[in-house]
């Protein structure tokens, strides 16, 4: 997906970018360069943040606990010359925030693919989401996600902050898609 975007948009024709894949129990930070992929998993995800910190306020009070290990990984990569030029987000929270912003009644991965979100978009959509009644939240994202969505949005904002990016590129392709593509490419070589 990135290779195709690099062909059509010079903004993404860079030697290094970082992909953040935020899950329920962990989040992966992946520095992608021409020399290879440098990744690390951190034991903080959306559900884990909700279970551990119980409130957004507590998560924000304890943000250093979350961010210091990530900051060390970022600094290690920068010392090795891996300074990301743009941020890619492919997990459920950023794609969902993009769909909210676009006013999609039904999620469509093709519509969010390649869109750009700014920090202010995450803040605005968090505010809009929190203004809904709990029942409206459940109707929008489902019973099992209604209470974790705010944690996901705040956590991703913290990740953007520590990475020092104001915007991120939204892609809706994950590990399975990447593995499938690599498998196809390996067979073609």
What is each PLM-predicted segment?
Residues 2-16, 31-189:
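Helical "lid/coupling" subdomains associated with nucleotide-phosphate turnover
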